[in-house]
A protein has these predicted regions:
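Ubiquitin-like/PB1-type beta-grasp interaction modules and other compact soluble beta-rich domains
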Residues: 1-77
């Protein structure tokens, strides 16, 4: 087993839409959505069984090990 170096961010294990994912420690929800190329204006995020209604808070919400996210996309149509 290796220990991460002090200058390397630790990886955190998450579950996203039922699939295992990992992110660097300190990653915000906003940064995670950007890494997936998702526009926060067209998704709804459930974080640990709680729907996040305040999209402004995405930038300050740091993800933690064990977090469970469900991300739902809005799809237009007619």
């Amino acid at each position: 087993m290796t220990t991460p170096l002090a200058h390397e961010p630790s990886a955190l294990a998450l579950t996203v839409n039922g699939d295992p994912r990992s992110v660097a420690a300190g990653t915000t929800l906003s940064a995670f959505l950007a890494s997936l190329k998702l526009d926060p204006r067209v998704v709804v995020v459930e974080h640990n069984r709680e729907i996040l209604r305040d999209r402004e808070a995405y930038g300050s919400l740091e993800l933690s090990a064990g977090d469970v996210l469900e991300i739902v996309h809005f799809v237009g149509g007619g």
